[in-house]
Amino acid sequence: YKRQLIRQFNDRYLLDVTKNKKSPIKNIIMNQKYIVGVGNIYASEALFMSGIHPFRLGKDITKRDCIKLVRAIKSVLKKSIKLGGSSINDHTMVSGKMGYFQNKLYVYGREGSKCVKRSCQSPIIRIVIAQRSSFYCSECQR
């Protein structure tokens, strides 16, 4: 069942979901109706990894963008699960232990810090989309 879900979440599916949408891509990928499990932190991280600006409209997302974004979302979710999630504020695992994914974040919560990409070093910017903080690099994400 798990493999079936993973296979069904692919670039064709994401392209179909985003086409003709006038909403920002970040809102689309956080909408649990379309993609389950992508919250605010994971959306910011996946968009950074795929080089997509969070305000970019769904209708402007290309097939190539979808390939990169699907790969990034899967990578972020797998890494987060492996590290026990993100213990920002009060989240803990069932065991009561804190997760460690927040120690590996590229952009989320790093406003003003330099981009992690050596070739860039631009400051990370914080914006608000649908009452949620979003973090991105203005040079790496278009």
Residue ranges and their predicted role:
Residues 13-142:
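Basic, nucleic-acid-binding surfaces and adjacent catalytic neighborhoods in DNA/RNA-processing proteins
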Residues 1-4:
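Conserved small/polar residues in nucleotide/adenosyl-binding loops
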